[in-house]
Amino acid sequence: MIFPIRCFSCGAVISEVYEEYRTRLKNGENPEEILNDLEVKKYCCRRMFASHRLDNDRELFDDIVEYK
């Protein structure tokens, strides 16, 4: 779905680095290195990025909207 503003577990704001993460991921960088560079250190916050679906630069939300 839409990327959350805050981590579900600890409540830290994570959405402010999402666009850079997405851009760098699309350029073929390693997700672990991107999160390290963006200083996303907590496991719960890293999980939010790792579990968010991006397929060919399309989010799950883009697929669901087609069926409204």
Swiss-Prot record:
Q: What class of enzyme is it?
A: transferase
- Which reaction does this chain catalyze? RNA(n) + a ribonucleoside 5'-triphosphate = RNA(n+1) + diphosphate
* Keyword check for Nucleotidyltransferase: yes
List, alphabetically, the InterPro entries matched. Answer: RNA_pol_su_RPB10, RNA_pol_suN_Zn-BS, RPABC5/Rpb10
Q: List the disulfide bonds.
A: none
UniProt-listed Gene3D superfamilies: Homeodomain-like
Provide the E.C. number(s) assigned to this enzyme.
2.7.7.6
Q: Which GO terms describe its biological process?
A: DNA-templated transcription
Q: Which residues bind Zn(2+)?
A: 7, 10, 44-45
Q: What GO cellular-component annotations does this UniProt entry give?
A: cytoplasm; DNA-directed RNA polymerase complex
Arranged from A to Z, the UniProt key words for this protein are: Cytoplasm, DNA-directed RNA polymerase, Metal-binding, Nucleotidyltransferase, Transcription, Transferase, Zinc
Q: Offer one Pfam family short name for this entry.
A: RNA_pol_N
The note on the cofactor says: Binds 1 zinc ion.
Identify which cofactors the protein needs according to its UniProt entry: Zn(2+)
Q: Where in the cell is it found?
A: Cytoplasm
| Gene Ontology MF, one | DNA binding
Q: Which NCBIfam families match?
A: PRK04016.1
Q: What does this protein do?
A: DNA-dependent RNA polymerase (RNAP) catalyzes the transcription of DNA into RNA using the four ribonucleoside triphosphates as substrates.
Report the family membership: Belongs to the archaeal Rpo10/eukaryotic RPB10 RNA polymerase subunit family.
Give the matching PANTHER family.
DNA-DIRECTED RNA POLYMERASES I, II, AND III SUBUNIT RPABC5, DNA-DIRECTED RNA POLYMERASES I, II, AND III SUBUNIT RPABC5 FAMILY MEMBER
Cite the record's note on assembly. Answer: Part of the RNA polymerase complex.
Protein name as annotated: DNA-directed RNA polymerase subunit Rpo10
Organism, as annotated: Methanococcus maripaludis (strain C5 / ATCC BAA-1333)
Q: Which gene encodes it?
A: rpo10
